[in-house]
């Protein structure tokens, strides 16, 4: 168990070859959104493509009924719509297969809402796909309703990103015990279910039950709606061109925390929003990442 430093993550962001193309850096998908919470999936989408996570192509997968509200936020990204009812996705195997075609990694759950069809979609992906999948927000709520043995059976490399209350729901651990022993319980759960667990907190714990990193980047200004959505976008972008390792996931957490710190310096901890971390420029962020402490 060790605190992650900037020197540890330089290998995650290598210098790119002049002859590389977008396919070299992965097609990634962001699946989420519903009529009530379209903003969450917009944040995840923007962070994956506009921050420094570096995916080659970002595909936003949303319910058909909210597509018009999402389209103005798309510049370089592509859009795939899923048939929906009352603003929520409907489960259809052929549509899901088409939506996930060619993807190197997927983030799911941001602003998704809770429904029987969403649970079916998540279960189908876990049982039938083979890709890194970042599960956040309502994706975690869907997972909490399932038999956790599905995590041991899946061919996906699962990355879970709960805050302590969400971790209580998916693990069954006592909330106070989680607050008192976050590293130990996170490691135990990750090892038992063969996942990478990113447990959010003042000190964020990232572990697969064997290797554990602690990330102490971040600020109080990030304690606001949407910060988790931004993190999920960053993570899936990184996983588009890196192996699904504890270090890769930790690098995403470090990057999100650093972006938050820089945004807080430009604004303040009271008025900053999650979207402000996205507006931190690529050049500014990378300059801080590679400079000395």
Language-model features: where?
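Small-residue (G/A/S/T)-rich helix-start motifs and N-terminal tracts that mark the onset
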Residues: 1-132, 141-159, 164-286
